[in-house]
């Protein structure tokens, strides 16, 4: 590859990452908008439905894409969270104990609650994320013995979101698929023993595109979900307000990455069009 081609490719990837950051900020901001305008209970319901829909649409296909579908259920679920989140730029750790118990940990700084946003997220909203996705992986795999034990929540002041998948000796009832055990702690993380993506099937260009798409998928899921939960009129207000706030806060940052600058409405519109082009 020539130096010019490599430089152009790096510039393209910077644009993709800027778009990813914008979508990331919008998704986090949307949750905070619902918390502050609708309250904790409504925000928890919204987050639950977003993550349940994501889980139903992406978990099983993702297992196959990552080559994890032949692993024991607890190991497959934990490795899925490790690899899929790693691709999206999330700080994440994985620890294998045995074929029926595997840990996953999201240490600070938390990706989803970036920066000071973490101070505005109630514990109930974080639990809704786990109920929506982690608690339902056993159901998706057809193994009702698989549950998730949460040992830490960063929004509660603990040093990360942490827990383990456990395959029990009996089928679990609905309220047993997510339980809390705050007295436990994950074993130390060893990156040398963690799973890794095969380089030949996951080259740099594919990883960069997946990084961009990771944040975009949350917004693509959240938009229709918020309409279903709150109705089109209230959803329109929440989406518009969040978009305006995030747009004002992130305009300079995104414009710089996309080769634009601060200006009047025409310049703002051009940055919007440039952002749309980088989503393709």
What residue spans do the PLM features occupy?
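Elongated alpha-helical scaffolds
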Residues: 129-133
